[in-house]
């Protein structure tokens, strides 16, 4: 492991420099991830139709709920790994890695089974109509088939960042984005798979990125790597992961509930086109949220490591700096959406 990839620099390098090194790759990855979500909408809108966009919008709460469970493990594991590394407890950090893998498999399988059986009632509850249910069902069923992959991919990416490889985490996300954007038009227009093609493009791209992550953590020379003895779930580690990840989980859950309520209201008072329009607005807002989340993801390893090393002033410094950047990005997003809203929306139709 090079000095640049060593987590030890988290306790010595200037905070501003560290936040730049860790946040920029995360921002690029999160922004690209948001852009490929927007690309899904653009390809589906032009290749399938407006009702398909409405169907896609109906899946947003369920995908957000899946992301909530992903953040429950991913954010908790990322922070706990950083704390363990700050304490120089490398064996403990490896056990967190093993527990992340098992937890993601368990939660992913449980989530998939539950919602495959309840998919239609859930989508109708979210605001689906007879015109949009087939699009939402076709898309979400395939996404659920790949849900375990999504959970593992998100969890391991979080550990990558915390273990000193923010750029590798970025490359994993960028690879998923590029592959998804390449497969989307091929599957939708070339093969004529419609909205199912977009879902398959998403799943396949994440499988490829997950494969790269598994190869990285299989290397015995890495500080954190797969080995015997780390896969048994430890109550202390699981409790630590879930307690840290509970806050972002509840935030995502509340976001999911808000979207459900709005979709149901729009179905009653605006119809399918109104739901589609709201879906477009959500995708645009999501872009700026992803940038802010990129700063948060860049901050977590720095704050976690220094907390574990008992360098509390550095934890305060990185938190304050991250908050300033977040306010700036949110203000920029607000101004753009107020000044040029029609130009932004035209991309989707």
Regions flagged by a language model, labelled:
Residues 1-23, 202, 213-255:
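Interhelical loop/hinge segments that connect adjacent transmembrane helices in multipass membrane
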Residues 130-153, 280:
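Alpha-helical transmembrane segments of multi-pass membrane proteins
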